[in-house]
Amino acid sequence: MAQRFLVVGLMLLALGVGARSDDKPGKVPAVATNSGLERLKKLAGTWVAADATGKPTDQVVSVIKITAGGSAVQETLFPGQPQEMVSIYHLDGADLLMTHYCVLGNQPRMKADPASPPNQIRFRFAGGSNLDPAKDMHMHEGTLTFVDDDHIEFAGVAWEGGKPAETHCATMKLVRKK
């Protein structure tokens, strides 16, 4: 019996190696491209809150990094703070998705609207986990505006009871930390 499992295992291993025989050692598989994901990758770095005049403050709001072999962008919001959260941006086929791991304990998933203006990526609710969108407070949509290479704005819209929760909608103006 053990020999049968060993033989089957070796056959599967041989098939797997044969199927990848044209891969070069150390070569990372090609990652699908999407203009929105490529724009997000250019945001890698640390972003601080802007003051009323648009100048950078010392308050770190977002740390963005490229991860998973270039197939995803990880954003850590309010790093090191009690309200720290993470958003992961990645592709599902041709669609750019954002999954927001919220301090509320839910994980809304949003899909980028392909009709977004050229200087924006608008994300719209597309499901999630640990939430009932008809009842629970959750991030329902967000718009990332690219002002220039060193200035972005993110307008988030939270929903509760199946409609926008006006007191939980806000815009963050961020400046790239130099």
Locations of regions flagged by a protein language model:
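Hydrophobic h-region of N-terminal signal peptides that target proteins for export
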Residues: 11-18
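Hydrophobic small-molecule pocket/channel-lining residues, especially in calycin-type beta-barrels
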Residues: 22-178
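Bacterial N-terminal signal peptides that target proteins for export
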Residues: 1-7
